[in-house]
Amino acid sequence: DEAPDFVKQVTAKMMEGRGEQIKVSEMPDDGRWPTATTQWEKRNIAVQVSQWEPEACIQCGRCSLVCPHGCIRMKVATPEALREAGADSTFKTVDAIGKEFKDMKFTIQVSTPDCCGCTLCVSVCPGRKKGADGKKTEERALFMETNTQELREREAPHWKTFLALPEVDEKLINVGT
């Protein structure tokens, strides 16, 4: 496991309900908690987790903004960056919207072990799938799917690929729109 010793010796015991086994000497002297430790707290508590339908997405970012656990992330990347990050044919992307993102791909990835299944992302999603007649349906770009072992195994490599993608150059983002 890649987790730091503090996470293994203290945080993990607390999460497992074994806090009484933590030695006083293992606790920080000044009471401060190390930063970035939540990245190791994969609880998988949701019965259902959100999934993304790229073709229905309008790339507004509401889902990422409203997610209380920060497990819905968005990125824009070049096809080359996607290849370098290890994206395969199952990694979902769609052409990015906006002239500043010409020839780039947009992706949303959900960290399924962090999702609590609250459905806030689905309720704020304005993106709708289109039916055979070309009209919008009630099906949204984000939807809930049962959090099975198969789903977790399918999505884990996608999350790893997503994290390997570079962050978008902030100069490309027009904050005035």
Name the predicted role of every residue range.
Residues 1-109, 114-115, 122-177:
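Ferredoxin-type iron-sulfur electron-transfer modules and their immediate structural context
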